[in-house]
From Swiss-Prot:
Molecular function terms, GO-annotated: 2',3'-cyclic-nucleotide 3'-phosphodiesterase activity
GO biological process: cyclic nucleotide metabolic process
Protein name (database record): 2',3'-cyclic-nucleotide 3'-phosphodiesterase
Record's catalysed reaction(s): a nucleoside 2',3'-cyclic phosphate + H2O = a nucleoside 2'-phosphate + H(+)
Family from the record: Belongs to the 2H phosphoesterase superfamily. CPD1 family.
Amino acid sequence: MGTSLWLQPPRNSPIWQQLATTIQGLKPIFSDSENFEPHITLTSNISVNTQGQVDFVLDRAVAAAKCVPQGFQIHLSSVKYGSRFFKKVYLQVEPTPELLSLARICREDFVYMPEAMSQARNYQAMSAEERQKIDTQVGQRAAEWTRNEYDPHVSLVYSDLYPVEDADRRTIETRLEDTFGSGYDESGLGWKNGRFALVRCEGPVDEWEVLGVRDF
């Protein structure tokens, strides 16, 4: 997974506190569960080696998010269950055009374009036509990834335990209703704007390293 770019609720906002409390509160149900901060992963597999590269990623993400005139809005919906460690229990996020556009830009600028430039013999020395061809291919690749692979969500549990038993599901859903209110999945739960965090996700979850953040 390497380094990932997270979109988080505004720090210490009510939704931040509710999600963080939920993540902590569900840990006893899963013996191998880890604690982590609430977030939506925009993209993974980012390669950064210097503080300058960290700053570039965060500043570029903020610039892209600020292109939304009315502010960047996140909408959460119903709880889902999966088989994968990082998608065991999660809240689905509405894939709005603004969110998908942001994820595509991040994938293109921070993952696919650096890969393409490193594979090119000398990108900067190429003709404008050659660079445009690479740029187009990278853009198409990012658009395809966004369309076919990107699935925005807010994880509540990391675990290898599978399946999630019916009794545990009932407990989880009761706790979610206690925290967010009955019918939370249809009540407009979410947040506006927030924080970008660049996180090195290597090794055990408790060893993940936050490389930098930007509030917007």
